[in-house]
Amino acid sequence: MVLIAGAVLGQRFRGGGRFGRGAGAGDTGITYTEGNVPVDTDKVRTAREIASHSTETSNWTNTPGFERDVFTFVRIMYRHGSYRSGSPWGWITDFPDSDLNLSFRLQQVTSLRTDPDGKVIRLTDPALFDYPWIYMVEPGTLELKEEEVPILRKYLLNGGVLWVDDFWGSVQWDNVESEMKRVLPERQFVDLDMTNQIFHCVFDLKVPMNKLQTPNMRQGIRSLDPSDPYSYGVTWEPYHPGGPETCKDMHVRAIYDDKGRIMAIATHNCDNGDGWEREGEDDGFFHEFSEKRAYPLAVNVIFYLMTH
């Protein structure tokens, strides 16, 4: 995969997105997106089949005969725990817009061909092993079921990679670390600093780590408003369990296999998903967070993981 044109990131989708919030997410039965769109978790298979609650994403097609020779954004449905340690949205946060927007941007600015529909599956779905990359959002309340633990372990040890994103503070970090210890008890997360090649493989991100931090859109807009004495310049979400001091600094952490391949990567104290999902709703948020942070980081992470 090679970079074709970074400049096109400056062309955002436009439309009247909603701040509306639905009834929260479960991993069985009917659940709702943040735009109150019902989703049958037993039937849903793609992001494309669910109505947008932000801005519509362009559709595209791939060369006939090569429809399966593509990168697919695979979102994992999972069970989540107490809302007191995180939001009620769990796995469905930012769905379906973040999945489709990132997929579109990947095929727009690189030579990588992407699935225009995306996938949403459970860890217990046999199709899991058809895809080399999976994504979990808001894993701060993740509760893996007993039958999911050995499946995820097998997936990761056999070449798959997991990206966990959008969780904040010490309490949510502790939960993610604990759940991953169930999967890979012999391994641990290590911090990646800005000298790591993952930050320079496509876009050369020569900035401090916190300059890659993306908050939710509301916080992002407030952080750009000099008339807001409380939030101007605050690109973190200060209200999560563990206290604001544990939410300030962004961390990118990884679990490696014995050959030095990343099996799991965590973007902690960062909401990349909102940067992808909400790109068309506010000019300031788009230019500061989607264009400069969430998209370049995602392109780098996916390129690196798919080529190493």
Q: What is the meaning of each model-derived region?
A:
Residues 98, 102, 148-151, 172-180, ...:
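Stable alpha-helical elements in mature extracytoplasmic
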Residues 112-122, 164-169, 187-195:
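Surface-exposed patches in mature extracellular/periplasmic domains of secreted proteins
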Residues 73, 133-174:
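Short alpha-beta junction capping motif
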Residues 78-82, 128, 139-143, 162, ...:
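Solvent-exposed loop/turn segments at secondary-structure junctions
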Residues 14-22, 27, 54, 84-86, ...:
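An acidic, glycine-rich "communication" segment
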Residues 64-69, 126-130, 155-157, 183, ...:
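Extracellular/periplasmic catalytic domains that process cell-envelope and extracellular macromolecules
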Residues 10-133, 137-140, 271-272, 277-308:
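Aromatic-Pro/Gly-enriched surface loop or interdomain linker
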Residues 3-10:
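Sec/Tat signal peptide C-region and signal peptidase I cleavage site
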